[in-house]
Amino acid sequence: MERPESELIRQSWRAVSRSPLEHGTVLFSRLFALEPSLLPLFQYNGRQFSSPEDCLSSPEFLDHIRKVMLVIDAAVTNVEDLSSLEEYLATLGRKHRAVGVRLSSFSTVGESLLYMLEKCLGPDFTPATRTAWSQLYGAVVQAMSRGWDGE
């Protein structure tokens, strides 16, 4: 990724990373609104959540949100050399495949990520920032998809 795009990503992430749980909850609220069929994939100790709200208030799911935000943070930190995260992201892809996540669902996750960024950043979420984040997310999903492909 080119330096101007990397800077847009880092600058915008600074605002988000001040409240990762709050913004991660926005991301997953949007995800469940767009693709409710994902909710049953989140089960902890055999517990099936009855609603997105039930899931989003669960301590176990809040821990999942924290982990997702840490993965995004790692991608932002390594935005100019994502190859250093390739094996980790492929392993993450395998783990998601193992619990029943469809690769196609990651496009909805991407939409939810952009939604969260827009809500957090307001007018600072410019078209250039949107494009930069779309490129970063696309690279992350490409690396994770190797976990589906078994590469």
UniProtKB/Swiss-Prot annotation:
* Protein EC: 1.7.-.-
Domain of life (superkingdom): Eukaryota
InterPro entries assigned to the protein according to its UniProt record, in alphabetical order: Globin, Globin-like_OT, Globin-like_sf, Globin/Proto
> Cellular location of this protein?
Cytoplasm, Cytosol; Mitochondrion matrix
Q: What's a Gene Ontology MF term here?
A: oxygen carrier activity
Supply one GO CC term from the record: cytosol
In its UniProt record, which GO terms are filed under biological process? cellular response to hydrogen peroxide; cellular response to hypoxia; negative regulation of apoptotic process; neuron projection development; oxygen transport; response to hypoxia; response to iron ion
Q: Where does heme b bind?
A: 64, 96
List the catalytic activities from the record.
Fe(III)-heme b-[protein] + nitric oxide + H2O = Fe(II)-heme b-[protein] + nitrite + 2 H(+)
Pfam families for the chain:
Globin
**Broad class of the protein's primary localization:** cytoplasm
The protein's UniProt keywords, in alphabetical order, are: Cytoplasm, Disulfide bond, Heme, Iron, Metal-binding, Mitochondrion, Oxidoreductase
PTM? Phosphorylated during hypoxia by ERK1/ERK2. Phosphorylation regulates the heme pocket hexacoordination preventing the association of His-64 with the heme metal center. Thereby, promotes the access of dioxygen and nitrite to the heme and stimulates the nitrite reductase activity. Phosphorylation during hypoxia is stabilized by 14-3-3 proteins.
Which enzyme class? Answer: oxidoreductase
UniProt tissue specificity? Widely distributed throughout the adult brain, including cerebral cortex, hippocampus, thalamus, hypothalamus, olfactory bulb, and cerebellum.
Q: How does it assemble?
A: Monomer. Homodimer and homotetramer; disulfide-linked. Mainly monomeric but also detected as part of homodimers and homotetramers. Interacts with 14-3-3 proteins; regulates the phosphorylation of NGB. Could interact (ferrous form) with G-alpha(i) proteins (GTP-bound form).
Q: What role does it play?
A: Monomeric globin with a bis-histidyl six-coordinate heme-iron atom through which it can bind dioxygen, carbon monoxide and nitric oxide. Could help transport oxygen and increase its availability to the metabolically active neuronal tissues, though its low quantity in tissues as well as its high affinity for dioxygen, which may limit its oxygen-releasing ability, argue against it. The ferrous/deoxygenated form exhibits a nitrite reductase activity and it could produce nitric oxide which in turn inhibits cellular respiration in response to hypoxia.
> In which family does this protein belong, per the annotation?
Belongs to the globin family.
PANTHER family registered for this protein in UniProt: BLR2807 PROTEIN, NEUROGLOBIN
Name this polypeptide is given? Neuroglobin
The organism named in the record is Rattus norvegicus
Lineage here is: Eukaryota, Metazoa, Chordata, Craniata, Vertebrata
What gene is this protein a product of?
Ngb
